[in-house]
Swiss-Prot record:
Entry annotated with the keyword Metal-binding: yes
Residues that, per the record, bind ATP: 46, 53-55, 99, 102, 107
Every ATP-grasp domain range: 9-244
Protein name as annotated: Succinate--CoA ligase [ADP-forming] subunit beta
Alphabetical list of InterPro entries matching this protein: ATP-grasp (IPR011761), ATP-grasp_succ-CoA_synth-type (IPR013650), ATP_grasp_subdomain_1 (IPR013815), Succ-CoA_synthase_bsu_CS (IPR017866), SUCC_ACL_C (IPR005811), Succ_CoA_ligase-like_bsu (IPR005809), Succinyl-CoA_synth-like (IPR016102)
Binding residues annotated for substrate, in chain numbering: 264, 321-323
UniProt-listed Enzyme Commission number(s): 6.2.1.5
Reaction(s) the record says it catalyses: succinate + ATP + CoA = succinyl-CoA + ADP + phosphate; GTP + succinate + CoA = succinyl-CoA + GDP + phosphate
Top-level taxonomy: Bacteria, Pseudomonadati, Pseudomonadota, Gammaproteobacteria, Enterobacterales
Length: 388
């Protein structure tokens, strides 16, 4: 679950990390009043969406008058911002962040992720702030400095100082950076984050460090013990189908193709998408119904898949290990009857009670194509789309 920049900076402040004075505003009038609270300009106004690339898309602007602030707010509030990280529809802008402008001398990068290979929280710092860290990693990886946190001792000040020296910081900046590092690491661990990024972390003309931007991603599996973060969720920034699927404990990701996929198990789901592509098809989604699939969840999964107007056929690929194929068959039959499926449905069942499941599908009298193998299923669903 991602947070907005203004929410990230609210958390930064509580962990002793410096950020520009700013206010999140929902109306043009609020935006003007925020400028008055901050004091003399110039100011920076930023659209609040869960996507990068806002500046290039016109969603971040340096302004010198309150009239410009009002004009920016009127231009964007209630509209959608399209960046290289969004789809063609963009994401809705419901808040504008108004901040005091900062005199920048140098831009740095500081971020952290969970490194699955080392099973540690790893901090990354670079002198190449203000640009995509992925680009830096690809072109000049030697400019990224890493520190892994020991899960027993947690973050240590010496690690912050070590990174500060590698970034070329001196004097009071070393202490300031160490404080930011310790605050960010504590925030990461206490709030069950999956990713955090300060890009850029700037050195001002006065020689001080300030968190100019903030990006936080919380671990969705830990939200049950993070009630404050749950309250910060902005459903408007999420795909409506993905949000609805999450309520049913379905892992759904919308894609751009026209073959809906319903599979149990993330690995099998990815393999299913691969074999659809191999035979010339385009998956419309990733959907994992999980190991504990019920008739109700399968029915809901069908509804979610078919809510996408692009879907011209549905591929159901079930391996019965924990889940019984006959129960999945009941769910498929119930969904087809309840939803009124008007597109071809190709089903491949294998494993626990697969024969019973296949018999139920055959006896249902519905227009469901039973496949004999994974390859056969992929070929049939691609052919079904081509025939429409």
């Amino acid at each position: 679950m991602n947070l907005h920049e203004y929410q990230a900076k609210q958390l930064f402040a509580r962990y002793g990390m410096p950020a520009p004075t700013g206010y999140a505003c929902t109306t043009p009038r609020e935006a003007e009043e925020a400028a008055s609270k901050i004091g003399a300009g110039p100011w920076v106004v930023k659209c609040q969406v869960h996507a990068g690339g806002r500046g290039k898309a016109g969603g971040v602007k340096l302004v010198n008058s309150k009239e410009d602030i009002r004009a920016f707010a009127e231009q964007w509030l209630g509209k959608k911002l399209v960046t290289y990280q969004t789809d063609a529809n963009g994401q809705p802008v419901h808040q504008i962040l108004v901040e005091a402008a900062t005199d920048i001398d140098k831009e740095l990068y500081l971020g952290a992720v969970i490194d699955r290979s080392s099973r540690r929280v790893v901090f990354m710092a670079s002198t190449e702030g203000g640009v995509e860290i992925e680009k830096v990693a690809e072109e000049t990886p030697e400019l990224i400095h890493k520190i892994a946190l020991d899960p027993l001792t947690g973050p240590q000040p010496y690690q912050g100082r070590e990174l500060a020296f590698k970034l070329g910081l001196t004097g009071k900046q070393v202490g300031q950076f160490t404080k930011i590092f310790m605050g960010l690491a504590t925030l990461f661990l206490e709030r069950d984050l999956a990713m955090v990024e300060i890009n850029p972390l700037v050195v001002t003309k006065q020689g001080d460090l300030i968190c100019l931007d903030g990006k936080l991603g919380a671990d969705g599996n830990a939200l049950f013990r993070q009630p404050e973060l749950r309250e910060m969720r902005d459903p408007s920034q999420e795909d409506a189908r993905e949000a609805h699927a999450a309520q049913w404990e379905l892992n759904y990701v919308a894609l751009d193709g026209n073959i809906g996929c319903m599979v149990n198990g993330a690995g099998l789901a990815m393999g299913t998408m691969d074999i659809v592509k191999l035979h010339g098809g385009e998956p419309a989604n990733f959907l994992d119904v999980g190991g504990g699939a019920t008739k109700e969840r399968v029915t809901e999964a069908f509804k979610i898949i078919l809510s996408d107007d692009k879907v011209k056929a549905v591929f159901v690929n079930i391996f019965g290990g924990i889940v019984r194929c006959d129960l999945i068959a009941d769910g498929i039959i119930g969904a087809v009857e309840e939803v009124g499926v008007n597109v071809p449905v190709v089903v491949r069942l294998e494993g626990n009670n697969a024969e019973l499941g296949a018999k139920k599908l055959a006896d249902s009298g519905l227009n469901i194509i039973a496949a004999t193998s994974l390859t056969d299923a992929a070929q049939q669903v691609v052919a079904a789309v081509g025939a429409k």
